[in-house]
Amino acid sequence: MLNTMLGNYFPILLFILVGLAIGVLSMLAGWLLAPNKPDAEKLSPYECGFGAFEDARMKFDVRYYLIAILFILFDLEIAFLFPWAVVLKEIGWFGFVAMLVFLGLLVVGFIYEWVKGALEWD
């Protein structure tokens, strides 16, 4: 029985190993075959054809990170909604109510962010 189960997963293992081998071999070939002749022009930072205006390590406003986190949160909400919509008939009322609670919590969180001014750019 164990041998049969392992045999069923062999194509998946083979697919993963071939994918890893292709990735590693292509990176290794590029590293070995590409010319490596660094000079001042190649090592200088490129900014739209001009010299760099500022240091590349400038500080970002925290609001950028906040907006990124909020985007990921609501993007994950959509990722949960698609499978839920597909199996809605099979999961019945319990799944429907559970998703309504989930969406309700997200709406309450969104209202809280709005009231606190997390979406304002003053």
From Swiss-Prot:
Enzyme Commission identifier(s): 7.1.1.-
Gene3D superfamilies, alphabetized: NADH:ubiquinone/plastoquinone oxidoreductase, chain 3
PANTHER family: NADH-UBIQUINONE OXIDOREDUCTASE CHAIN 3
Gene Ontology terms, MF aspect: NADH dehydrogenase (ubiquinone) activity; NADH:ubiquinone reductase (non-electrogenic) activity; quinone binding
InterPro entries named in the record: NAD(P)H_OxRDtase_bac/plastid, NADH_UbQ/plastoQ_OxRdtase_su3, NDAH_ubi_oxred_su3_sf
Annotated function: NDH-1 shuttles electrons from NADH, via FMN and iron-sulfur (Fe-S) centers, to quinones in the respiratory chain. The immediate electron acceptor for the enzyme in this species is believed to be ubiquinone. Couples the redox reaction to proton translocation (for every two electrons transferred, four hydrogen ions are translocated across the cytoplasmic membrane), and thus conserves the redox energy in a proton gradient.
Record-given protein name: NADH-quinone oxidoreductase subunit A
Native organism taxonomy: Bacteria, Pseudomonadati, Pseudomonadota, Betaproteobacteria, Nitrosomonadales
Record keywords, A-Z: Cell inner membrane, Cell membrane, Membrane, NAD, Quinone, Translocase, Transmembrane, Transmembrane helix, Transport, Ubiquinone
Annotated Gene Ontology cellular component terms: NADH dehydrogenase complex; plasma membrane
Subcellular location: Cell inner membrane
HAMAP family xrefs: NDH1_NuoA (MF_01394)
Catalysed reactions listed for this entry: a quinone + NADH + 5 H(+)(in) = a quinol + NAD(+) + 4 H(+)(out)
Quaternary structure, from the entry: NDH-1 is composed of 14 different subunits. Subunits NuoA, H, J, K, L, M, N constitute the membrane sector of the complex.
Entry annotated with the keyword Flavoprotein: no
Database matches in Pfam families: Oxidored_q4
